[in-house]
């Protein structure tokens, strides 16, 4: 596989400081304006990130053992960890980007199990200990592009999803892979209260074609910045597909099913004209209400330092993944 790492010093960026075009999407779909408004405290907190004011401390996770394959490393200074762990999209804990860090401590991950079923010869149920014993972890520095128009670069720790799927031995009927987030309203307040969770249908679900899931770039991610994922980043295990928009990166996964037909996905069900199943990063296919031709790389400087730059096809991974979509109309299959 040809390694592509089109990164510059300005590409290593913090978790987005921008609030929620998607919040606006929900509002325009007719949901409660009160649930979608940005509180003054959160707005002030947003400005403090740009001004370099007080920030929450970085989440303190368990250090992980991992290798660092050279083709996935960028010799660049990473943005402080507290920005990645303190500003997140995870609607199960609220709509504001500060909500997950504030409220995700209710998530219980100690006895986590992940089930692999469906069109497989060997269904599996694995604990996180099983996963760490069976699958060697490695750090990969990946670009991440949000559908909202911002991007960053994150040092994930994880392993190739394809290795887990191979262990389950997919049958010849398997064509797609469906993913499910934990459904636990007692732990995830957004699942219990539509006002908090934006009115999404929970649990959050996502999907990939089998060949996308088997691609070597596709990760099941267990850590960030060398430590176990904190709850707000999708602990204890999440999906990372670097050539797709960030909403494909489903968090806190409890079930992976290999299936015959294209599975439903949360944002596509909510607004199919705005969020496609494929969700490949594509500067030539705009969101119905904003351009995807450019993006904001969010750095550690002030708000005046935030500048737009061209969005790369497949988020810069075209040499590695474009062949998956040969002959497919990317405008129709967005």
From Swiss-Prot:
Catalytic reactions on record: L-methionyl-[protein] + a quinone + H2O = L-methionyl-(S)-S-oxide-[protein] + a quinol; L-methionyl-[protein] + a quinone + H2O = L-methionyl-(R)-S-oxide-[protein] + a quinol
Record-linked CDD domains: YedY_like_Moco
Keyword Chaperone applies: no
GO CC annotation terms, alphabetical: periplasmic space
Enzyme Commission identifier(s): 1.8.5.-
Principal subcellular localization: periplasm
Annotated binding of Mo-molybdopterin, by residue: 88, 91-92, 146, 181, 233, 238, 249-251
Role played: Part of the MsrPQ system that repairs oxidized periplasmic proteins containing methionine sulfoxide residues (Met-O), using respiratory chain electrons. Thus protects these proteins from oxidative-stress damage caused by reactive species of oxygen and chlorine generated by the host defense mechanisms. MsrPQ is essential for the maintenance of envelope integrity under bleach stress, rescuing a wide series of structurally unrelated periplasmic proteins from methionine oxidation.
Entry protein name: Protein-methionine-sulfoxide reductase catalytic subunit MsrP
Provenance organism: Erwinia tasmaniensis (strain DSM 17950 / CFBP 7177 / CIP 109463 / NCPPB 4357 / Et1/99)
Record lineage: Bacteria, Pseudomonadati, Pseudomonadota, Gammaproteobacteria, Enterobacterales
